[in-house]
Amino acid sequence: MKIALVSPYDFAHPGGVVNHILALDRQFTRMGHDVRVIAPASQGVPTIGDRFIPIGRPRPIPASGSICRITISLWLAPRIKKVLAREKFDIIHLHEPFMPMLCSAVLRYSETANIGTFHAYHGSPGYNFGWPISALILYRRRRKLMGKIAVSRPAMNFASNHIPGHYDIIPNGVDLEHFTPDVAPIERFRDGKVNILFVGRLEKRKGLDHLLKAYRQVKAEVPESRLIVVGPGTRLRKKYEKHVRRSGLKDVVFAGYTSYDELPRYYKTADIFCTPATGRESFGIVLLEAMAVGTPVVATNIDGYAGVMTQGKEGLMVPPKHDTELARALLLLMSDEPLRRQMGARGMATAQQYDWKKIARQVFELYIKVLSEPPWRRRFPEYDAVSASA
């Protein structure tokens, strides 16, 4: 089957949607399908080679305390028409159809079956820029979306307010061959200190300021502890580093951007993974990554995280923006190594449910279902639902 995966975001910059598409590309290619990724790109994308089709030049746009890298060109039509006519896709799978401008333009000129995956919800980065117009355009073209996927119930609730109808909830996945408990920890952090790990962009909504305040309380009670901050910097990084210096807080390591290959080693190095996001998260991908490696989690009890983990099972959940509660949860796990091991083992079991192999098969089954119905009524005997779920 020939499949197009369309991203509105700069494919040269890592992020949740980009990583999701890369995972589907890997799995579908392994299944024997002919996959192309269509997206804007600020530079080359060597990871997928000639399977990548660049359309549009992304621009960095400040949005919701983040940077949204999308193409806002109104002159995409000639390139889109040429690509669609040449490639003749069986399925076009649009990711974040609400985001301007690429997905709505591809949908306009598509003459094949179209699927949309809705990853985020109102308040997510970029959704205060352009999405009301895109939502109106998408509503007018909604009949061209033959299948709608939401990665979580919060994402579905938001999307269905604007594009009503049936949604299949198919979550994000985790690559269990990559995020594995068998990876080696980072040697320089193996000095007897209890390591707390944060992974994410240094944006206000990720809650690092609350973790720094909580860690100040933790450090006072457990001097032999360390906070490792992993993630691409933003304009807030200098502010956070200045706060750490002025407060005299020791053992806070800003590791900066870490490659996908190196990331599992950070999770393995951590005794506790902490994600204190304040909201606007439709799904907890970083939770799954930590769980897959066997690291217990301390997370805020927000909608996107509550759908992935259970309080007291894979870790502990606290109210968002409650620094003292966050510190208390961290201290509880730091003082109880058997509990950490127990929660880590439960997390690994939970992560098995989100194996990208399983998730990709669920998505592919929807492709088959859509193509077997009017107006397509196409049959792919070699890819029936039984073989897809094998």
Residue ranges of each PLM-predicted region?
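Acidic donor-binding loop of glycosyltransferase active sites
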Residues: 268-282, 295
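Nucleotide-activated donor-binding/catalytic signature segment of Leloir-type glycosyltransferases, i.e.
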Residues: 238-258
